[in-house]
Amino acid sequence: MSTPNSYDDEELEELLRRKAAQEQKRIEEERKRKAELESQKESILRVILTPEARQRLTNIKLVKPEFAESLENQLIALAQSGRIKIPITDEELKQILEQISQQNRRDFKIQIRERGWK
């Protein structure tokens, strides 16, 4: 005897199938949205970077993907706000990378104290 609040196996399986289908659809929509955003970003980068600078950025992306993502976003923001000359050449990109490198550089001081072992 089933109670009004309980589900039988078929209803439960149908609920699970619907939930799984909804989740799959959500994941697919998220993937499409990310692909569209990436396509838009690549399109903007093609406009604001020379081919040589784009190649350098691609090489950076292979080695440091998170850094490259951050750099792409910064370059797009600078270009859209008009704070940088377009197109950005490879030399200008090198200068930007050098500035970022100097900002992130940390000086470490290592002190070695001698201990008398007895």
From Swiss-Prot:
PANTHER family: PROGRAMMED CELL DEATH PROTEIN 5. GO terms for cellular component: cytosol. The keyword Nuclease does not apply. GO terms for molecular function: DNA binding. SUPFAM superfamilies: Double-stranded DNA-binding domain. The lineage of its organism: Archaea, Thermoproteota, Thermoprotei, Sulfolobales, Sulfolobaceae. Belongs to the PDCD5 family. This is DNA-binding protein SSO0352. Pfam families: dsDNA_bind (PF01984). HAMAP family: dsDNA_bind. NCBIfam families: PRK04239.1. Keywords: DNA-binding.
